[in-house]
Regions:
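Short polybasic linear motifs
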Residues: 2-8, 12-16
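N-terminal signal peptide c-region/cleavage motif recognized by signal peptidases
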Residues: 35-37
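Catalytic-site microenvironment of enzymes
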Residues: 5, 39-438
Length: 438
């Protein structure tokens, strides 16, 4: 489902200390330093201050031309990063925070570029294998959102009368479960990031009240509410409990999944599974719409406001320098073509400035989401179907039937099998076409 704009707030500033060497007026020195300390770092909710020294691994791994091209065409279009990134002839000067700079040295030529150190392997670096195109490939499957009782908190479910509830987190988990043996049969080593309906983080909303209040204040909410009256309360977004819940499932949960992916699984590819939706009103009296569509997302299209946060700027540079873009785009295009052919869905088109069309099919868009930002490897982020479309609702209610059934004059497989088939065929086709082509 398309992510709402996140509220953000400034993180805890870096502590600075004044020694006796500060002079005869230590208190005055402290007061002079205080403004710099208070505003030296700006972080998104629940984020740690980035360790900029980690970017030293990318010194001289990319030419100036390649850096400028990716920055302007994919990651920070329309000069979004100009305030913090100054490109010179042989280096880029990057603001770490309000007071410190990181210096990135460019490679003098593509031939002299140093090898990019990363935990994932590009498909082109694998030996050709048409029989088992995913042999030696580590794939992490990230079923989007939460299921079970958590779905109501996340507002990712709806029900019409006595029908089967439509719950995105349960549906993505079911698709993931079906994907595992299919990908394994093609040689892949597959790991589920989430294998049950509940969260992978151990933090719960009631532990995030302090951060929630800070987030609301940073967003300019003056009348912060201590509680709200339920999902239909029009003022719920101004309350601490609602904001704490949002930070729990939208931010903390994704940070934990990122730790699992980057520190434990270390895959070559992540599949983020989602079902899209249009506004449906209330969960107990939803509006079904006639539109149904498909699109895929890769990381990019950062705004000036987003790059004003130190951790987002750091993560953007990591993705750019890690050179995930070519892999993400090419693989996403293969999956998009496969899913479009099997589902018959048209491409979704963004009209907002927070997304940029990339590639050639019309199905793939660059967008800055927390998951595709924090996962330090190629991410294929699928938004298939519109959950509250009339067509999808009818097919979902039919369940996991065998074979084909007639829907609106078209013989269709069950919705889960269709999702799985489109994904598997696209990934297999990409690796068959790309392996051994370095």
């Amino acid at each position: 489902m398309k992510e709402r704009l996140l509220r953000r707030y400034a993180g805890t500033p870096t502590r600075r200390y004044v020694s006796a060497a500060a002079g005869p007026f230590p208190l005055l020195s402290l007061l002079l330093l205080l403004p710099m300390a208070c505003f030296s770092q700006r972080l998104t909710p629940l984020s740690n201050a980035p360790d900029w020294d980690q970017l030293n691994r990318f010194q001289e791994t990319m030419t100036r031309e390649a850096f400028v091209d990716l920055l302007g065409s994919v990651y920070a279009p329309n000069g979004a990063g100009a305030q913090w990134i100054k490109v010179e002839a042989t280096r880029a000067l990057i603001q770490e925070n309000a007071s410190d700079q990181f210096v990135l040295q460019f490679a003098s030529s593509a031939e002299s570029s140093k090898t990019v150190p990363r935990y994932w392997t590009a498909a082109a670096n694998l030996a050709a294998n048409n029989d088992l195109p995913l042999s030696g490939v580590k794939i992490a499957i990230d079923p989007g959102h939460l299921g079970g009782t958590w779905a109501k908190m996340e507002e990712r479910w709806f029900q019409i009368g006595d029908s089967i509830p439509v719950t995105e987190g349960d549906m993505t988990l079911r698709v993931a479960q079906l994907l595992v043996p299919r990908l394994q049969s093609l040689g892949a080593k597959v790991t589920l990031v989430r294998s049950s309906p509940g969260p992978v983080t151990t933090v719960r909303p009631d532990e995030l009240n302090t951060q929630a209040e800070a987030s609301l204040r940073e967003s300019g909410i003056k009348n912060i509410l201590p509680s709200y009256a339920g999902p239909d309360d029009p003022n719920r977004e101004d309350s601490i409990p609602w904001e704490a819940q949002r930070l729990f499932y939208r931010v903390g949960e994704i940070h934990t999944r990122a730790q699992i992916i980057n520190e434990k699984i270390k895959p070559d590819l992540v599949l983020c599974l989602h079902f899209d939706a249009e506004p449906w009103g209330t969960s107990t009296n939803p509006v079904l719409v006639s539109v149904n569509h498909l699109h895929l997302l890769i990381n990019g299209a950062y705004s000036t406001g987003e790059l004003g946060f130190d951790d987002e700027r750091f993560a953007m540079l990591w993705k750019l320098l890690d050179q995930t873009y070519p892999e993400e785009l090419a693989c996403s295009e293969y999956v998009a073509q496969s899913m479009a052919r099997i589902t018959g869905l048209p491409p979704y088109r963004y009209s907002s400035p927070n997304a940029k069309s990339v590639g050639w099919s019309g199905y793939v868009w660059a967008r800055n989401l927390l998951a595709n930002r924090l996962y330090e490897c190629p991410v294929i982020f699928i938004e298939a179907y519109v959950m509250n479309s009339q067509e999808f609702f009818a097919r979902f209610q039919a369940g996991e039937y065998e074979g084909f059934r007639n829907f609106g004059g078209v013989m269709r497989q069950n919705i889960f099998e269709e999702y799985v088939q489109g994904t598997v065929e696209g990934i297999a086709a990409y690796f068959r076409a790309t392996r051994g082509k370095r």
